[in-house]
Amino acid sequence: RIIAQCRWLLPLSLMLVGTISPDIGLGATVVSLAPVSAVHETGVTISIKSREFSPNTVSLIMGQKTRLVIKNLDTELHAFLPVGLMTDSHLNISGNGAPQFAKDGLVRVLLPTSGQTEIVFIPSRSGTFPYFCDLPGHVMRGTIVVHKNEAMIE
C-alpha cells in the first residue's frame, strides 16, 4: 500500500538520510527530497607549498556545488584571496583558517602553518577569477575559471 501511494515519487531523485536527533527521536529516518544536481558536488584542492599554489589554474562549473579545500603545507602563514568569485554567495566555511568578510562576501582566508580551510559554495557566474596571497613578499597567484557547463572544459 505504501509503495502504491508513493509511485509518483519514483521519477524523482531521492536521498535518504538516517539520523539520531533529540527533536525527532532515536533511530528516526528523515527523508530529504533533493534533485541529483543539488546532491552532486565537485571537490577541488589547492595546496600551498614553497610559496606556490598548486594547481595554479582550477576549473569549476557554474551552478554546480563545489567543495574548495585550501591546504597550507608551508611553514609560514599564507592568505587566499579569491577576487570576485565568492561575492554575494552563500558559503559554508570550515577548518582552522581565519576567513575575513566585507559587505559583499568573502575577502580572504588566512591559513596558519599546516592549516586547512574548506569552502562549500555554488559558483553563480562564469568567468576568470584570480586568486593570490597578499602577504608582504609573497607573489603567489592562481586562477579559477568558472565555465558555463562541462562541455566548455578542455
Regions found by a protein language model. Give the residues of each.
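Solvent-exposed loop/turn segments at secondary-structure junctions
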Residues: 74-76, 86-88, 137
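Bacterial N-terminal signal peptides
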Residues: 9-21
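Extracellular/periplasmic metallocenter environments
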Residues: 26-32, 52, 103-154
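N-terminal edge beta-strand
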Residues: 37-65
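Bacterial N-terminal signal peptides that target proteins for export
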Residues: 1-10
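Residue-level signal for short segments within beta-strands and strand-turn junctions
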Residues: 82-86, 148
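Short aromatic-acidic-glycine turn motif
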Residues: 86-97
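Beta-strand cores of secreted/periplasmic/IMS beta-sandwich domains, seen most often
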Residues: 56-81, 116-125, 130
